[in-house]
Amino acid sequence: MKKFFALALVAPLLISCSSSTKKGDTYNEAWVKDTNGFDILMGQFAHNIENLWGFKEVLIAGPKDYVKYTDQYQTRSHINFDDGTITVETIAGTEPAAHLRRAIIKTLLMGDDPGSVDLYSDVDDIQISREPFLYGQVVDNTGQPIRWEGRATNFADYLLKTRLKSRSNGLRIIYSVTINLVPNHLDKRAHKYVGMVRQAARKYGVDESLILAIMQTESSFNPYAVSRSDALGLMQVVQHTAGKDVFRSQGKSGTPGRSFLFDPASNIDTGTAYLAMLNNVYLGGIDNPTSRRYAVITAYNGGAGSVLRVFSNDKVQAANIINSMSPGDVYQTLTTRHPSAESRRYLYKVNATQKSYRRK
């Protein structure tokens, strides 16, 4: 309640974040209310950041961006998992180097428990871990991975001496330090979850390469991943759609909680269970496994109903039409005629990424 109250009080604001469609076709009133409330709070949060940092300086956590504010929103750490960079910045008017130093150390040594960190408040709730999430993904100025506080502190001091930059937003001076992740940072993150992926793949009969491709496309293996539609975790599961469908299929009532979906193993299990539901239930009428895979991938992003409606408003007729087409024609149709540009691109991205995992 304390964290929610802090967010609710974050006054005035802007709107900015990556779009993400709701996974699944179950849209109920409770989901709409929750989403509208979340949108309002996100708008307030963004507006507060704009007031402090400036119009072009709004940064909010997303599926592939870890953003954490501290020091009354005057300091922030941003990990861009696509670009492979860590940027720590502050607008603190006094002792900016000290603020940066603390944030650098905390970011380098933070654990991989997203449920313990509130990305929408300035509470300094980042716990230093003996198994840092970024261990092996970043090395210090001597080329060594960073596990202990002493090494992180020395590296922070080195960065402040050699890489400190400043710029003006028109109102304040922004001091920053940028650190590059190692070139194979994506593979290092993916490796953390291979065992969980293998277990879920066997449990639900889903190809490991598809699960990994979905994870890379959705979150770039960022366990802290959130979206504007409140999709959570590595596979970007929405509680009130895909999450609820999976719980219902497993004989559970209600919806999975945020802490449940922020747990990597639970998130991967739920996302994979939903892929199996799409494959075996919602799109089970598609005979050709390759055509069905294309449909499942697209449906994971935009829903099974929207996939079938590309071919016909009648679900049975849609499946019959798909069954009369070659897999190549199904792919071409979904990547050119699906009403959502995001879903069209999604199939292209996931299919290409899955091919790369099959070659490994």
Curated annotation (Swiss-Prot):
Cell compartment(s), UniProt: Cell outer membrane
EC number: 4.2.2.n1
Alphabetical list of InterPro entries matching this protein: Lysozyme-like_dom_sf, Murein_transglycosylaseC, Murein_transglycosylaseC_N, Transglyc_AS, Transglycosylase_SLT_dom_1
Subcellular location, principal: membrane
Record key words, sorted: Cell outer membrane, Cell wall biogenesis/degradation, Lipoprotein, Lyase, Membrane, Palmitate, Signal
GO biological process: cell wall macromolecule catabolic process; cell wall organization; peptidoglycan metabolic process
GO molecular function: hydrolase activity, acting on glycosyl bonds; peptidoglycan lytic transglycosylase activity
Signal sequence interval, chain numbering: 1-16
Record's bilayer topology term: Lipid-anchor
Lipid-binding residues (covalent, N-palmitoyl cysteine): C17
Role of this protein: Murein-degrading enzyme. May play a role in recycling of muropeptides during cell elongation and/or cell division.
The protein's name in its UniProt record: Membrane-bound lytic murein transglycosylase C
Gene designation per UniProt: mltC
